């Protein structure tokens, strides 16, 4: 449904990220995580066609609806939804109520795959639990950005971590991600330790050969 090949995104002072290959299916429920400034929202904007300043291939074979910076956009945006969204922007609702209203619109059954940026940022606990229930009842998937670990663990079955300009995939919830990440870190540390040992062995061997 969403296919990315050899994607390179740069900003004026550096390469933001490079993604060799990434495929997202329509029923995937994914969290995109990573530290601030790593390019998470930029990646969503590229997928949506809102940012075309990149190298590589991005193909989307399905309708998308999304919420970025509290602004809902969909393929068939009805006058009623637009009117309600404008009311929230005009300040007639609290930030939490405005976001809840927009998320309700976004979660309409007529929409397809969702892309959502920080969906719980202005929600109280009750509103967050309602959102979790709605997301879990959906038959189609979503890709969301969030720093809320509890929310991710309850709604997502796959984690994409944007780190050091690369994407690492974890096929499980947030708890699985934490466990698997620790295993990968230990494996990399062991690999590096073995590399250093082998490097020193070869250096010693070369030194002995020179002496003889």
Label every model-predicted segment.
Residues 1-188:
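ABC ATP-binding cassette signature C-motif
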């Amino acid at each position: 449904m969403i296919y990315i090949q050899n994607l390179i995104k740069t900003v004026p002072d550096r390469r933001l990220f490079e993604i060799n290959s990434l495929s997202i299916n329509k029923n995937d429920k994914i969290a995109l995580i990573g530290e601030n400034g790593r390019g998470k929202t930029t990646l969503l904007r590229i997928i949506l066609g809102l940012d075309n300043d990149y190298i590589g291939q991005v193909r989307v074979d399905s309708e998308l609806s999304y919420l970025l910076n509290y602004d809902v956009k969909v393929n068939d945006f009805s006058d009623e939804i637009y009117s309600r969204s404008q009311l929230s922007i005009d300040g007639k609702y609290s930030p939490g109520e405005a976001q809840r209203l927009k998320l309700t619109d976004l979660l309409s059954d007529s929409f397809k795959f969702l892309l959502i940026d920080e969906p719980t940022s202005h929600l109280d606990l009750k509103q967050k639990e309602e959102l979790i229930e709605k997301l879990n009842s959906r038959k189609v998937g979503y890709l969301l950005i969030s720093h809320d670990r509890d929310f991710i663990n309850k709604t997502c079955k796959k984690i994409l971590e944007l780190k050091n300009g690369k994407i690492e995939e974890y096929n499980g919830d947030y708890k699985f991600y934490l466990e698997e990440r620790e295993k990968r870190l230990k494996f990399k540390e062991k690999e590096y330790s073995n590399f250093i040992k082998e490097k020193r062995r070869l250096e010693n061997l070369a030194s002995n050969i020179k002496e003889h």
